[in-house]
Amino acid sequence: MGRNTLGINCMSDTFDVIVVGAGLAGLVCATEAADAGKRVLVLDQEPEQSLGGQAFWSFGGLFFVDSPEQRRMGVKDSHALALTDWLGTAGFDRPEDHWPRRWAEAYVDFAASEKRRWLYDMGMRWFPVVGWAERGGHGSIGHGNSVPRFHVTWGTGPGVLEPFVRRAREAQARGKLQFGFRHRVDELIVERGAVVGVRGSLLAEDKVERGKPSSREISGAFELRAQAVVVASGGIGANHELVRKYWPERLGAPPAHMLCGVPAHVDGRMLDITEAAGAQLINRDRMWHYVE
């Protein structure tokens, strides 16, 4: 298969970890792995100027529980209240909801303990007034947050990304992390029941401005291997066909016109690719779309 734009041999070079997706989730995963001493490769179909994905366009609101900002405003919050709010919203009423519930419990634990300090130590700061997004009713008995928990980061989305982009560049300078932009993953390689690498298409170089659709012209192919492959790409907000396909039945027919609040590359294509490799995808009708 020759050589790709990374300047590495596509057939023989291996990495400890390949991360598919250079958005916020991918950057967090990649920097944590690199700081743990792993050799990491981050692949993304978009050009380098789109590093950070759709998080760049976000308002930068973060979920903290019983934070200094809340206490300063007189907001009385607690781990127990936050978990009750979360469970009241999510429901977790399907047989496949065991692991989603476990994840929710772990995330509330994180938000009520080390999350803020971890981000603060990386340089992140927050607006002193806590917002009340996803507002619930009276008391923690139904849908939404019963108290304000929406902590807006100074610098909004770019401010959330900055520490992780910085850490990624530092890891890159140490030789622990490598980026492969314009590398579109089309297949996860499965051998003996395990994912061992990725195959895909090299997309033509494109200097398009961040947020605008980039070219899908194919200029080559690649195959890369790793001990672990992490797919950190799952948003479907710009793929209205996919949104309509999995539109919740309880809401009736999907709307004929949809307002898109994310760039065109938020296409959800890695969902089917991951499922084809053996992943179990659940709750595809439970969507959350923010118009950033």
Where are these regions (language model features)?
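Extreme N-terminal leader/targeting segments of oxidoreductases
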Residues: M1-V17, D35
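N-terminal Rossmann-like FAD-binding beta1-loop-alpha1 element of flavoenzymes
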Residues: V17-V42
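Glycine-rich, N-terminal phosphate-binding loop of Rossmann-like dinucleotide-binding domains
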Residues: A22, D66, L202, S233-G234
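Generic hydrophobic/aromatic pocket-lining and core-packing "Φ" positions
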Residues: L27-A30, R116, L271
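Glycine-rich FAD pyrophosphate-binding loop
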Residues: D35-F56
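N-terminal glycine-rich dinucleotide-binding loop that anchors FAD/FMN and/or NAD(P) in oxidoreductases
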Residues: F56-W86
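Conserved redox-cofactor binding core of oxidoreductases
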Residues: A104-F222, A226, N239-V243
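Glycine-rich loop(s) and the adjacent beta-strand/alpha-helix scaffold that form part
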Residues: E205-E292
